[in-house]
């Protein structure tokens, strides 16, 4: 049996939006209440199946580099997709999404797949970022959008599956494939609307 194709995915966004928590929830189904330090772990792997083919998602975290604006073109090298993350309880992190999108344009390959993810949607009473405005922005870019919660797990797997589907469609010639979600044994089609917190 041959090794699976590798999709390199980057997690970017302002510091403390929960990028590492999203990664750990998806890759390990774990969540830590306290801040997670990724300086010792740069990436995690998880295998998924799309249209009967196994793919390895190699998901890279910025490991705190975003605090110092030291993310360089080398971080983006070879990336197939980028999850741009913000915190729904922090308007500034959403405002900075445009800067992150500009950075993707500057450093990533043309046509890299992107997904916009608003994290911490479980904190309804503290929510500041309007869902419809974020959705309109994502629609204007022609990219998937969803709100997720690393704490509860809501839409975390869906966000990474949306990314995998985008990469598959853009780089492998697929078209809205059915995905066997890891751990669920079932399939889902990412073409439908996502539920929000």
From Swiss-Prot:
Which residues are the lipid attachment points (S-geranylgeranyl cysteine)?
197
Membrane association type:
Lipid-anchor
Q: Where is this region: Disordered?
A: 175-197
Give a yes or no for keyword Membrane in this entry. yes
Localization per Swiss-Prot or TrEMBL: Cell membrane
Tell me which GO cellular component terms the UniProt record holds.
lipid droplet; plasma membrane
Q: Which GO terms describe its biological process?
A: hypotonic response; vesicle-mediated transport
Q: Which UniProt keywords apply?
A: Cell membrane, GTP-binding, Lipoprotein, Membrane, Nucleotide-binding, Prenylation
Q: So where does GTP get bound?
A: 13-20, 61-65, 119-122
Q: Does the keyword Amino-acid biosynthesis apply?
A: no
**Which GO-annotated molecular functions does the record name?**
GTP binding; GTPase activity
Q: Which domain of life is it from?
A: Eukaryota
Which Pfam families does the protein's record reference?
Answer: Ras
| Alphabetized InterPro entries for the sequence | P-loop_NTPase, Rab, Small_GTP-bd, Small_GTPase
Which NCBIfam families does the UniProt record give?
Answer: small_GTP (TIGR00231)
Family (UniProt)? Belongs to the small GTPase superfamily. Rab family.
Record protein name field: Ras-related protein RabG2
Species this protein is from: Dictyostelium discoideum
